[in-house]
């Protein structure tokens, strides 16, 4: 419905990763997409597969029809919402809900999603099995607290975060299984 080109987007990622809400947004926008399943949390081989498209070796990676490469879930989702405004997955720059949209997109990405990098592989920050267990416990607690903090600040009554319309953040919340 919103397709501007026949060249598909190429999305690198796996189920449950930051690629999930990007894939949902592309699907809701009816944009052509080729999905390349890659799970960097499964080890060096998988991270190596990402090297050519993302030197940081993380997902999601979205290759635009122009060949340009984008990374970072929030950046991709905001770009898609801005590039395809008719899809209604994010408020227009002049919309009164735009500030909250950007606030919560950034919060989820920086305060919550970033913690999964630690939680998924505690050995990145811990030097012993005991320390890994502590890191895992504390990151899991912090993730839950961030969701509680966000929930406490949500307006009551509207169906979605920004009122009665679906937004990118609603996709993240529902599809990431938080």
Language model region names:
Residues 2-134:
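GST-like domain detector, emphasizing the conserved glutathione-binding G-site
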Residues 2, 105-178:
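GST-like fold's C-terminal all-alpha helical module
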